[in-house]
């Protein structure tokens, strides 16, 4: 099935392609990787993405977002994939924004969604241990290792 973008979606894709080729080529990814950046991404690049409105693409307009949809966001990720762009856009702009929009209380939406849009927060997904029904039997232990690491049951997971 061919996906045909409308004019706005194509424009967003073109802007993303131009921006990422200029500001986040594959060499940028290698630099982040080789310097062992604790965040795992470039804070200035993330701020620039926020300034372009990418963090608010899936956020409803009533919370300061653009409510542009998954196809629009997908066109950005297609270009990010070509450049191997490390950023918190998926964790924040897709997972965080979607989960809060779909399952958050009105208070949570009013508090967190505008902060996702303006880039003042980033989010991460935490998964509970569904096979454990007693609080005394939970194996996951969260400790502070760095901004991007979580040690869970003797295994390091990168968020």
Regions found by a protein language model. Name each.
Residues 1-90, 111, 115:
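Amphipathic, small/basic residue-rich leader segments at the start of a protein or domain
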Residues 79-82, 99-102, 158:
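Active-site catalytic microenvironments for nucleophilic, acid-base chemistry
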Residues 149-152, 156-159:
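Single conserved hydrophobic/aromatic residue that forms the stacking wall/gate
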Residues 85-107:
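N-terminal glycine-rich flavin-associated loop
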């Amino acid at each position: 099935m061919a996906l045909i973008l409308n004019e706005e979606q194509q424009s967003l894709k073109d802007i993303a392609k131009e921006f990422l080729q200029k500001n986040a080529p594959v060499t940028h990814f290698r630099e982040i990787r080789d310097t062992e950046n604790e965040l795992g991404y470039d804070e200035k690049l993330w701020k620039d993405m926020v300034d372009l409105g990418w963090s608010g693409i899936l956020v409803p307009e009533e919370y300061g977002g653009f409510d542009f949809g998954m196809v629009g966001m997908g066109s950005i990720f297609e270009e990010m994939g070509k450049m191997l762009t490390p950023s918190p856009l998926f964790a924040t702009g897709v997972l965080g924004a979607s989960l809060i929009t779909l399952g958050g209380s009105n208070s949570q939406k009013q508090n967190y969604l505008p902060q996702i849009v303006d880039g003042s927060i980033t989010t991460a997904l935490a998964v509970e241990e569904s096979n454990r029904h007693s609080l005394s039997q939970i194996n996951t232990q969260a400790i502070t290792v760095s901004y991007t690491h979580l040690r869970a049951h003797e295994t390091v997971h990168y968020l």
